[in-house]
């Protein structure tokens, strides 16, 4: 959206929009270490949990927001596991078929004494089924909770970038667009149900464009 807005405003005609996430290397921190400790023990804080997965205002974990969404909309454990298994299986099939090979830039990674070419997403768990997911225990800490290590989002590292340019510049350079940006929107919801944020933004996009949800062939959720 920011790239498109820069182009629409005339501030740019080509923008590389990118982002990255490195959860596995998030450090542990001693929050008072900069100014020194007097006496007693110090506690190491997991910055991945504290800075990324915990609401800054209400201090609850992201897993609790997922539990809240389940409570609010009556989502069952069976529905969670079925959706998760289906998602894993689709991803596994897409990787096996090489659907994203042309979009992936292999990265050389040193593993022990060997250089390994990293080019496959490690996130999907091969052979995941509803049956295997149903055996996992809740990990959110909520009594009677539904969120498990199998139906929750994983701990991942990754990066992506896309080149966005004006139609005029694309024609000038002879570039064939892969897609056209039509509209974007931001939507805000209560932090305790943050998982439904895309619903609010999608409704705004539909209102701006006059489209309906049936006009979309693919929705990334």
Regions found by a protein language model. Name each.
Residues 1, 24, 53-61, 74, ...:
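Active-site pocket-shaping loop/turn-to-helix segments
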